[in-house]
Amino acid sequence: MTYYLPPEKGEDLLGEASARRILEDAMVRDAELVAIPLSRLHADMLNLSTRQLGLFLQKLTTYGYRVAIVGDIEPFIDRSSSLRDFVYESNRGQHVWFVKDEAHLREKLG
C-alpha cells in the first residue's frame, strides 16, 4: 500500500482546510493512506471537545483514504481518557490508526 507522509516540519494542521491541502498532496502521489506526523497536529486537534480532529479525519476518510497519525501519543492519552478511548477504538479498525513511528506503520501494513 502506498502512503504519503508529509514533512515533520511545517504549518500546524487544524481542521478541514488542512485536510484539503493534505488530500491534494496525497492525490498527486497516488497514495492510499495518509500518514500524518503527530508533531504537525495543532494542539487543539488532540482536545476532542474542539471536534477538530474528527473533522480532519472525516474529510480524509470520506475521500477513501486511510489515515495514520505517526508519533508517540502516550503523553497525550495519559492526560485525556476520551482521547485514550478514541485512540484505542481507532486502532481496532482499519481506517484510522495511531502508530508510534513509521516502522510500526509499515509493520501494520504488512
In which residue ranges do the predicted regions lie?
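Amphipathic, Lys/Arg-enriched alpha-helical "gate/interface" segment within cytosolic domains
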Residues: 2-110
